[in-house]
Curated annotation (Swiss-Prot):
Record-stated family: Belongs to the NanE family.
HAMAP family: ManNAc6P_epimer
GO molecular function: N-acylglucosamine-6-phosphate 2-epimerase activity
Pfam families reported for this sequence: NanE
Protein name: Putative N-acetylmannosamine-6-phosphate 2-epimerase
Keywords from the named record: Carbohydrate metabolism, Isomerase
Function recorded in the entry: Converts N-acetylmannosamine-6-phosphate (ManNAc-6-P) to N-acetylglucosamine-6-phosphate (GlcNAc-6-P).
Class of this enzyme: isomerase
Stored InterPro entries: Aldolase_TIM (IPR013785), NanE (IPR007260), RibuloseP-bd_barrel (IPR011060)
Catalytic activity: an N-acyl-D-glucosamine 6-phosphate = an N-acyl-D-mannosamine 6-phosphate
Pathway this chain belongs to: Amino-sugar metabolism; N-acetylneuraminate degradation; D-fructose 6-phosphate from N-acetylneuraminate: step 3/5
Amino acid sequence: MSLLAQLDQKIAANGGLIVSCQPVPDSPLDKPEIVAAMALAAEQAGAVAIRIEGVANLQATRAVVSVPIIGIVKRDLEDSPVRITAYIEDVDALAQAGADIIAIDGTDRPRPVPVETLLARIHHHGLLAMTDCSTPEDGLACQKLGAEIIGTTLSGYTTPETPEEPDLALVKTLSEAGCRVIAEGRYNTPAQAADAMRHGAWAVTVGSAITRLEHICQWYNTAMKKAVL
């Protein structure tokens, strides 16, 4: 059975939650063994897949979980706004570390390596390719190039203003166009994740609301301070 077919079964049985285990950089939680522990806890709680950033984190996680891992490498480049899995060597390193799916930036922006080249390299390793997109045009272009999974990950992050709510319209548009969509980006409540599934998402990735303790504390602190002003 193919990995996509296996995931279809898991999603039907468990609901389609993917947990992104990416601690705040330099946080006390930003250690491979802690990332792996969070991933294992998520798997035991019913997550159908895990999203991991960084080769060391992926290696540690691969050793303890059996669910599929979506791997990425983030870089801050001087000559490109693209941050997610920008280089061939990133793809190779993630494949060697045990990723099942490799996600890349799929936006139409200046980049060191073309999207189609990165997709070809992912497929060279026999792995599934996911593209993190920001618009319908991004997603449809990446689907035509052969990406098996389209993520709404970068919606709201390629423009000056980032909205508070997730982009359900993008999920619906891409799903209706025939894309296998992972909804991602600002899904901070179970209700929002459920809405994404109703709008046609294949699965939903949740990160900050589950694995970024600093963000969760900030949400509570902000709300509670407002309550006593």
